[in-house]
Design a protein with these regions (language model features):
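Beta-propeller blade termini and top-face loops
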Residues: 1-464
Length: 464
């Protein structure tokens, strides 16, 4: 928390029990040098010495110690989200030697950055327990060197897209986070966004597609961003938007029976309350797809990869047929199922960017049959309109007044009880003065409702 300390990105233990640390930038530091790009070590856990300082003040650093030699280490540096530099030492950090960067065969991945701008996320190294010249490196894909980084071989591919289709190596899910060797062995587990992969021997012919296996049978660890369930009584039908594992449809009971509707990152998804064949799924930002025949055919209902949040909040009023999604700090998108994405309408919610971008929605049908829409923002503002499909909806700020207002923070959920003016709002920020708020007068005033939850950030609640 202090502005004069280094921030740790990685801690490793050398073969002689020396502690090695890779740093990242300390954003509490006001100076130009924020402490990133350092390799440090300690023999007592109290005093640390800088063994290497990146000249360009890089950010995140990952360190790999050779299990068979206390003298050999490798390190990789991130700068501005990209893979910047790889280095090695064979004298415990007294001198360092530059190592070449792997080049991914994927034509969509820059030749100078195998992380594709995600080195803040997918960055990993490991040295073989039996040979200090053999190193595994993970970014979007998996690489191996058997000569200290003089040359790299791509031994895993996430797809068969352009450039990868003709590459002879095993499928390994994108975004590599860790390698774990069995002590004294060349057996290796690989941790990815798609779970665990197993290499019985990393010294095997790694261009053989059969030498790395997916090892996720019964291992259900996929992170879900969003989901929906059929309202048809007794029917097994769900949609689930997963982190880097697509949007999946589950139409039979039990796990591992899913059908992937769309790939990449799945997000908000919906099943019609009255017709199971009508569904909506999403990819990142404002890329939403719809179907009216259970994915026999589909079309984009909103098509904008430049606006909205990465996992973009949305709500579908399928009784009136309209989808609403976050667009910018003052606007939302609106379009009707079955309508071309080119006809999506931009609707202004509030006139000042300081009031934040949409972060949560809630829709209900008024007694007049119109779409009543609530929009929460990422700075704690709450708005409502009684006719969201009007050509120019009229919005009311119902954040509340001093003493009974929603606190500043990210509104993560809005829930209105059926046939009631009772409204609940959750705030996802840790340390917020109130993280569950209730209004019994449709938003005129709000009061804190959590009991014994402290300052936990909350993402969701539901009720009748």
């Amino acid at each position: 928390s202090s502005s004069n300390v280094y921030v740790v990105a990685d801690i490793e233990l050398g073969a002689d029990n020396r502690i090695w640390v890779g740093t990242r930038q300390n954003y509490l530091q006001t100076a130009t040098d924020k402490g990133g790009g350092r390799i440090m070590y300690s023999d007592n856990g109290t005093t640390f010495t800088v063994a290497y300082s990146h000249t360009n003040q890089a950010g995140r650093v990952k360190v790999a110690c050779a299990p068979s030699s206390a003298y050999t280490l490798y390190a990789v540096f991130e700068a501005n989200g990209k893979v910047d530099t790889l280095i090695r030492t064979h004298n415990k950090g007294k001198t360092w030697i530059s190592v070449s960067k792997p080049k991914d065969a994927d034509t969509g991945i820059p030749g100078t950055d195998p992380s594709r701008g995600q080195a803040w996320y997918d960055l990993s190294l490991a040295v073989s327990p039996l040979d200090t010249t053999v190193v595994m490196a993970g970014f979007v894909d998996v690489f191996q060197t058997q000569n200290k980084g003089l040359a790299w071989l791509q031994v895993g591919k996430w797809s068969n897209n352009s450039g990868l289709a003709n590459l002879s190596c095993a499928y390994v899910h994108a975004d590599i986070h860790t390698f774990t060797f069995k002590p004294g062995s060349t057996e290796c587990l690989i941790g990815t966004d798609g779970g665990i992969f197993y290499a019985p021997d990393v010294m095997d012919n790694m261009t053989n597609q059969a030498v790395i296996y997916e090892a996720n049978n019964g291992f259900t660890v996929t992170q879900m961003y969003w989901g929906d369930i059929s309202q048809t009584k007794g029917k097994d039908l769900m949609l689930a938007g997963a982190q880097d594992n697509g949007t999946n449809q589950l139409a039979t009971s039990g796990l591992c029976n899913e059908n992937m509707i769309s790939g990449g990152d799945g997000g908000y998804c919906f099943i019609s309350q009255t017709n199971d064949n009508k569904q909506i799924v999403s990819y990142v930002y404002n890329q939403f797809y719809s179907t009216t025949n259970n994915w026999t055919a589909n079309a984009k209902i909103i098509d904008d990869a430049t606006t909205g949040k990465f996992i973009n909040p949305a709500v579908w009023d399928d009784l009136n047929g309209y989808l609403f999604t976050g667009k910018s700090k003052v606007t939302i998108y609106r379009n009707k199922l079955g309508t071309s994405a080119t006809l999506a309408t931009t609707v202004t919610v509030n006139g000042t960017a300081a009031n934040g971008a949409p972060s949560a929605f809630c829709s209900s049908i008024s007694s007049a049959g119109k779409t009543q829409l609530y929009v929460g923002t990422d700075v704690g503002k709450l708005y409502v309109t009684t006719d969201a499909v009007a050509s120019a909806p009229t919005w009311k700020d119902i954040t509340g007044s001093t003493g009974s207002a929603i606190p500043a923070g990210n509104i993560s959920c809005i829930h209105r009880l059926r046939l009631s003016d009772t409204l609940f709002v959750t705030i996802s920020n840790y340390g917020s003065t109130a993280n569950i708020l209730m209004s019994v007068d449709a938003g005129v005033s709000h009061c804190a409702e959590e009991v014994q939850l402290g300052t936990l950030g909350l993402n969701w609640l539901t009720g009748q």
